[in-house]
């Protein structure tokens, strides 16, 4: 039986990494948080790997790895998914299971971009930057801005999912202030949205090139708008790679080189 890699996924890099691992001869167990994510990310690879829907808690991940569920963990969760990254790194350290963090490449935005180190800090800064705000930070984080509805005109772009809508409504947003859309979006499309809603400030997070931040920020730059960027948490002390090839090489260092196979179609 081949060596098994647990791929903690949920972003667009997941299928790319899975394909690279499969081509290198590893068995892959990929995780996503929702059934929608499974279909969206892994429908073309579903016959080549195992996809587990639902996240791990610390006890369930510990049990899975302790029982031989995987020989290595490749963490390709979102750059802002700090909880699962810390959880996985802690469990792997306790079990001496190799852990590798895939960190998508960052991007340097234009001069004049305003930065905040947290969502709460961003909310405190917003009233000094403008009054018509477009939030593109994910529905779960909108709660940090709920207190600003009486002072500012807030709009939010969220995923077209029921749980996202519920989180946005609980944060005080109305149907008129929500855009339920699934990325990716072009620079021109971002520009048209910002113009249509007469936005003065774009709020986004440093989620990297693959996260669509370039198209958003450059659209705001085209229109002369301000951008408030929430900094990415630093993966302190973690073994990190930023390309699929580098991820495979580290797997080979830890697990040995397996017999590669034909590319997965």
Task: Please give the residue ranges for each predicted region.
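Short, polar loop motifs at secondary-structure junctions
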Residues: 32-38, 102-106, 139-141, 160-163, ...
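Glycine/small-residue-rich loop that forms an oxyanion/phosphate-binding "nest" at active or ligand-binding sites
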Residues: 62-122
């Amino acid at each position: 039986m081949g060596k098994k890699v647990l791929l903690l996924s949920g972003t667009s890099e997941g299928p790319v990494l899975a394909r690279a691992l499969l081509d290198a001869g590893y068995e892959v167990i990929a995780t996503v948080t929702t059934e929608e994510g499974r279909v969206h990310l892994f429908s073309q690879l579903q016959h080549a790997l195992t996809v587990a829907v639902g996240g791990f808690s610390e006890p369930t991940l510990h049990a899975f790895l302790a029982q031989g569920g995987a020989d290595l963990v490749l963490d390709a969760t979102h750059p802002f998914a700090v909880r699962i990254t810390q959880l996985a790194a802690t469990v792997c350290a306790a079990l001496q299971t190799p852990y590798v963090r895939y960190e998508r490449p960052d991007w340097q935005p234009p001069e004049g971009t305003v930065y905040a180190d947290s969502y709460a800090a961003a909310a405190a800064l917003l009233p000094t930057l403008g009054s018509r705000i477009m939030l593109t930070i994910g529905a779960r984080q909108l709660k940090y801005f709920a207190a600003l509805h009486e002072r500012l005109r807030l709009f939010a772009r969220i995923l077209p999912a029921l749980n996202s809508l519920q989180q946005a409504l609980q944060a005080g947003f109305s149907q008129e202030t929500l855009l339920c859309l699934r990325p990716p979006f072009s620079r021109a499309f971002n520009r048209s949205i910002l113009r249509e809603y007469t936005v003065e400030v774009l709020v986004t997070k440093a989620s990297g090139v693959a996260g669509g931040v370039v198209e958003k920020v450059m659209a705001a730059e085209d229109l002369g708008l301000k951008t408030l960027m929430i900094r990415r948490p630093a993966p302190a002390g973690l073994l990190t790679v930023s390309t699929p090839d580098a991820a495979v090489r580290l797997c080979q260092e830890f697990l040995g080189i397996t017999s590669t196979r034909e590319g997965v179609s």
